[in-house]
A protein has these predicted regions:
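Nucleic-acid-contacting surfaces of polymerase cores and analogous helical-repeat interfaces
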Residues: 1-39
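Flexible, low-complexity segments enriched for small/polar residues
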Residues: 24, 28, 32-59, 68-203
Length: 203
């Protein structure tokens, strides 16, 4: 750090070191990068990381302002980074339960499903937690488990969890196009590509 601290300061020496670390430019950039990686992309744009790091420094490390900078940035709303992140297994399971309106009173089967998808809860060995990098969640085995989870959920094959299919496919949606539109609106909350629509119409 390029600083010399005289001996004999006791606990104050330790606090001084922590303060030097907290105010170091590398700390501002590291924290800003990790937050941008969490909310934007595995490799967030350097320009955004720089702006967030500048806010971190100017606000004396106010994380709220750093997050505000990221979430209100043009990059956050850019089509290039829209839905750029792969959900972790826990995020996938929670959002699927919410999107389908499933009723559940059994945590164990869901926790087991999350573990099979690669994220055994509270069992991450490094103290830093599970990776924010999408590649950590993507493999042929974990993708298969994600598909199995989706099929089991919508097929009501997860013990203690029920999905009301009629909520997603009402009598008014017998027309295939309307059914696909309703499912996309309920589960995706925005449009999908023409190729995806064509593939759905073949199911």
């Amino acid at each position: 750090l390029g600083k010399r601290i005289a001996a004999g300061g006791g606990i104050e020496d330790g606090l001084r070191v922590l303060e030097l670390l907290a105010r170091h430019p590398s700390t501002a950039r590291f924290i800003s990068f990790k937050l941008a990686q969490r909310f934007i992309a595995d490799e967030p744009p350097a320009s955004l990381v720089d702006r967030a790091a500048d806010v971190f420094t100017k606000t004396d490390g106010d994380i709220r302002e750093v997050v505000r900078t990221i979430l209100t940035s043009p990059e956050f709303y850019s089509p290039r980074y829209y839905r750029n992140k792969i959900k972790s297994p826990l995020e996938l399971a929670a959002s699927a339960i919410r999107a389908t309106g499933a009723a559940t009173d059994a945590a164990a089967p869901l926790v087991q499903a999350v573990a099979r998808m690669g994220e055994p809860l509270y069992q991450c060995q490094p103290p830093t937690g599970y990776s924010e990098d999408s590649s950590h969640w993507l493999s042929s085995a974990t993708l298969l488990e994600r598909m199995n989870f989706a099929v089991a959920l919508i097929g009501n094959r997860i013990n203690g969890t029920r999905v009301d299919i009629s909520r997603l496919a009402t009598p008014e949606t017998k027309d295939q196009k309307r059914l696909i539109d309703n499912l996309i609106a309920a589960l995706i909350h925005s449009d999908v590509s023409r190729e995806t629509r064509e593939n759905l119409s073949k199911v």
